[in-house]
A protein has these predicted regions:
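Hydrophobic/aromatic residues positioned on beta-strands within the core alpha/beta folds
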Residues: 76-77
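Acidic, metal-coordinating helix/loop segments flanking the phosphotransfer/catalytic sites
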Residues: 27-44
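Active-site residues of response regulator receiver
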Residues: 48
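Charged docking surfaces used in two-component/phosphorelay signaling
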Residues: 12-20
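Conserved acidic carboxylate
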Residues: 5
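Acidic catalytic/metal-coordinating carboxylates
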Residues: 30, 55-61
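C-terminal output helix
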Residues: 97-110, 118
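Receiver (REC) domain active-site loop signature in two-component systems and cognate sites
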Residues: 51
Length: 121
C-alpha cells in the first residue's frame, strides 16, 4: 500500500495503523515522490489531493498515462472531488474520518484489484 500525504504526522499515523493491520506500507510526501513508488506495485494507493510539488490530481493523471494496470486509488482528502475529475477512482474518503471507514475501503479495494490504464478506456 502506498500512502501519499504531505502532512508528515498524518502520513505516519496512517502508516502505523495500517501496518498494525498487517499491510505493507510505503509513504510518499507528494505526487512526484509517489510516481517513483509505482514500480513497487502497491496493492492500493491512499491519495491526498492538496499537496505541494505535484498534487493528487496531477499524480493521478500521470499514473493513468502509464501503460498497464494500476492499483485502486482511494482519495483521502478534505476536498471532495467529483468522480468526473478522477475517472476510474476506486473510492473517496473525506477528512476527517473514522479509521474503521478507511479499513473498510482498503479491504474492498484490495479485493477489487488493479484497474486498466487510461489508454484502455
Amino acid at each position: 500500500m502506498l500512502v501519499v500525504e504531505d502532512v508528515a504526522d498524518l502520513r505516519d499515523f496512517y502508516a502505523i495503523l495500517l501496518r498494525e493491520e498487517g499491510y505493507d506500507v510505503a509513504c510518499a510526501c507528494d505526487g512526484s515522490d509517489a510516481l517513483r513508488w509505482l514500480s513497487w506495485r502497491p496493492d492500493v494507493i491512499l491519495l491526498d489531493l492538496m499537496m505541494p510539488v505535484m498534487n493528487g490530481y496531477e499524480f493521478y493523471a500521470k499514473m493513468r498515462e502509464i501503460p498497464g494496470d494500476h492499483p485502486p486509488v482511494i482519495v483521502v482528502s478534505a476536498v471532495a472531488p467529483m468522480r468526473a475529475e478522477l475517472p476510474g477512482i476506486h473510492a473517496t474518503l473525506p477528512k476527517p474520518f473514522e479509521f474503521s471507514q478507511l479499513l473498510s475501503r482498503v479491504a474492498t479495494a484490495v479485493t477489487h484489484g488493479p484497474t486498466p490504464s487510461a489508454a484502455a478506456f
